């Protein structure tokens, strides 16, 4: 069910970005709504404020590297659990938590920069609303994941998991990897296209 939802979600986002907007711009006369309409993406609309769109390099690329690294540190922690290597498990989880919180810090900085220096706000038309909704919703899920990782880390410190019994650890790990994969899709669709 979740896979179908996210396939539909990203498919719809891809459709809007790559099919609807060009069609409205008159690339296909059958879909043209207004003869003189020219689409521009990103756009604030005809009466929206001017803004600078967010680029893919800089903080977004750094955040992508941070999340991918956090997936690797979490996998390394999992290997430590399976080998009953508690120091590897705990260090890997701690690094993953630090990387997740760092991602959130950079995202907060990116939002502040967008609002104060780029003019990119929630009121900046469809682009601004879409940008903040998609990245903010993902940031919320990263926050939930970081909290769950902290709970699992506390349980690991108390010795609650073994190589044979660690369902909660695996559930949180799957969630975290899912958040990583969703970010890759967002990075491509929101920042590159």
Feature-to-residue mapping (PLM):
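...captures the hydrophobic TM-helix bundle architecture rather than a specific catalytic motif
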Residues: 1-193
């Amino acid at each position: 069910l979740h896979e179908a939802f996210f396939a539909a979600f990203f498919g719809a986002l891809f459709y809007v970005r790559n099919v609807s907007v060009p069609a409205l711009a008159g690339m296909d006369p059958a879909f043209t709504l207004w003869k003189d309409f020219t689409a521009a993406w990103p756009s604030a609309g005809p009466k929206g404020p001017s803004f600078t769109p967010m680029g893919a390099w800089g903080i977004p690329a750094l955040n992508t590297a941070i999340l991918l690294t956090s997936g690797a540190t979490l996998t390394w922690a999992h290997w430590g659990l399976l080998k009953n290597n508690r120091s590897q498990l705990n260090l890997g989880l701690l690094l993953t938590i630090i990387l997740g919180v760092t991602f959130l810090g950079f995202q907060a900085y990116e939002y502040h920069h967008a609002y104060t220096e780029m003019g990119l706000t929630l009121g900046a038309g469809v682009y601004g609303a879409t940008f903040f909704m998609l990245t903010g919703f993902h940031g919320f899920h990263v926050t939930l994941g970081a909290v769950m990782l902290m709970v699992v880390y506390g349980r690991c410190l108390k010795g609650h998991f073994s190589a044979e019994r660690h369902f909660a650890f695996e559930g949180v790990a799957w969630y975290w990897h899912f958040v990583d994969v969703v970010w890759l899709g967002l990075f491509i669709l929101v920042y590159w296209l």
